[in-house]
Each structure stands twice: as structure tokens, then as C-alpha cells.
């Protein structure tokens, strides 16, 4: 919802800069595919602000399932500054998993929200802020979510087997001051890490 803070020109400039840098970007209705040694990952994007809002993403997810081996859904939605996810958001995320999502990650609330595993699939309801210059009072906690996959290919069929071999959470502080160039910083103190996780 902030992609047009600087108007259409700002949005298009950002897309062009990402393209020049070779960084993939996504938006509602645009599936991004990445292929590594024949293994294809699809990234599906969408917005969810109320019950049933995942329906548009289900169309993209169906296409992604037909054209890739692993599907990541990244959604934007939910109530801001609330640490608990809403029942409707949980139901929508479960629906995405039921329709083939292999990982579901959320954003928008500006705060961390819980994670859960549903039918073997990890759902991260909100990663909070990461790089944020919108105001000087964001929640100062965020994390990097790192999911490790082991992929094996069947020599006879060529098909892939994917195993989730672990999740690493890297707690970070969010900084909004220009002196730090708005860059997040990894939390090194073990006690402080526990406050985030």
C-alpha cells in the first residue's frame, strides 16, 4: 500500500531500478518464477484485507502449481499494530495451503505476528517492518525468516522431492534514523534475541 507514496512515477522508477539491478519484484497478479538446476519455484503475491480476499491469489496459485515445483505465497494484509492474527486471516492462509501453497508469508501489520505449521506448511502471519522510514515510531523488532529446503531429483522420473530441513529466525532491530541509513541490524545479545523470538 506504500508503493505509490511517490505517485505512479515513483512506482515505475522503483520497478526500473530493480530491473536494472537484476532484482525480481512482485505484485498482485504477477507470478515470479525462479529456476535452480531444473527446480522451479513460484512466488505468488496478493493483498488480503478481509475474509475471502485470498480468492484472487488462488487463481495465480493454480497457475503456479501447474508450472512449478514449489509455491511461495507472499501476502499483504491484516490489521495494523496488532500482534495476534485475525481468525479470517488464518482461515484464508489455511485455504491457500489447501490449494497448494508450500510456504505462506505475510506483511502489513507493522509488527511481528505468530507463525504456525498447518498440514506441514509453515505460515508466517507477519514479519513486521524491516526497512522503514514512514515515521520515527515503528516497533523496533523484526526478523529474517530463513527456510532451508533439501531438494532431491529422481534419476528415473526427473521429478523432485522437497523436504523442509529447518527454519532459522534471525532477530533484528529496525532503525529509522538517517544516521543508520534506515538499515536493520542483527540482534547479537542473546537475551534481546529471546524478546523477539
Give, region by region, the residue ranges found by the protein language model.
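Acidic, metal/ion-coordinating pockets
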Residues: 1-197
